[in-house]
């Protein structure tokens, strides 16, 4: 699987995230000859246990994240952050969980945007919105380098692309920037060769960071 970075929009102090940022970002991709390939969607759910007996609470993870990825439509990924565990399951697991009612989705976030091809790169740019809401909570951008699946070998190329991207975006004088978070995948038992589990971990930690950043800016 190609190496992928998941960037998130970090607003400047005192500014907010809006659909206008997404519009500017997609226009910027097209201005550097990105070819639009279609829509892009993904979902993230934040689960909490439905405990009938509080005495059992120590036996269950306090919370975990479930993620569906656009490029893995038949799979569903779980991340238990406190225990540094990432699991891959069949997408039907969501229906099973609904019937069992052992965990309930407390927060659901949708990623909605567009996919582009740009040379050896595939880009996905989209807004993050809660269920049944149009309030934009964030902007996320996937950068995928198609020829390489080794994170170490792709590092330099990805950094160079990010420089070019930030230069192009800087011309638009937007109140913030896209940032990449360096992660220690070894903590989750993941190696150098990129897998969908790497992407799931990226999303889990990017979302936690993005929510904290937005709250700090508002504060």
Swiss-Prot record:
GO cellular component terms given for this protein: mediator complex
Q: Membrane spanning segments where?
A: none
Q: Which Pfam families match?
A: Med20 (PF08612)
What is an example of a GO molecular function annotated in this UniProt entry? transcription coregulator activity
InterPro entries cross-referenced by the UniProt entry: Mediator_Med20
Primary location recorded for the protein, binned into one broad class: nucleus
Q: Does the keyword Transcription apply?
A: yes
| A single GO BP | regulation of defense response to fungus
Entry keyword set: Nucleus, Transcription, Transcription regulation
| Keyword Transcription regulation tagged | yes
Q: What is its subcellular localisation? A: Nucleus
What is this protein's function per UniProt? Component of the Mediator complex, a coactivator involved in the regulated transcription of nearly all RNA polymerase II-dependent genes. Mediator functions as a bridge to convey information from gene-specific regulatory proteins to the basal RNA polymerase II transcription machinery. The Mediator complex, having a compact conformation in its free form, is recruited to promoters by direct interactions with regulatory proteins and serves for the assembly of a functional preinitiation complex with RNA polymerase II and the general transcription factors.
Family listed:
Belongs to the Mediator complex subunit 20 family.
**Description of how the protein assembles with itself and partners:** Component of the Mediator complex.
Protein name stated in the entry? Mediator of RNA polymerase II transcription subunit 20a
According to its UniProt entry, this protein's organism is: Arabidopsis thaliana
Source organism lineage?
Answer: Eukaryota, Viridiplantae, Streptophyta, Embryophyta, Tracheophyta
């Amino acid at each position: 699987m190609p190496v992928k970075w998941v960037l998130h929009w970090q607003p400047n102090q005192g500014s907010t995230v809006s659909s206008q940022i997404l519009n500017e970002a997609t226009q910027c991709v097209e201005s550097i000859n990105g070819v639009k390939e279609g829509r892009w969607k993904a979902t993230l759910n934040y689960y909490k246990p439905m405990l009938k007996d509080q005495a059992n609470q120590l036996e269950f993870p306090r919370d975990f994240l479930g993620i569906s990825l656009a490029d893995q439509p038949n799979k569903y990924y779980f991340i238990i952050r406190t225990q540094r565990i990432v699991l891959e399951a069949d997408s039907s697991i969501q229906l099973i969980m609904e019937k069992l009612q052992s965990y309930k989705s407390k927060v659901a976030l949708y990623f909605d945007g567009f996919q582009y091809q740009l040379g050896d790169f595939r880009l996905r740019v989209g807004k993050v919105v809660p269920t049944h809401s149009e309030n934009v909570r964030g902007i996320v951008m996937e950068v995928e380098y198609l020829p390489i699946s080794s994170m170490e070998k792709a590092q330099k190329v990805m950094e160079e692309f990010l420089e070019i991207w930030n230069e192009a975006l800087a011309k638009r004088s937007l109140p913030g920037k896209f940032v990449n978070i360096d992660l220690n995948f070894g903590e989750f038992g993941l190696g150098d060769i990129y897998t969908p589990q790497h992407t799931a971990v990226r999303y889990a930690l990017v979302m936690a960071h993005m929510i904290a950043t937005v709250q700090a800016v508002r504060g």
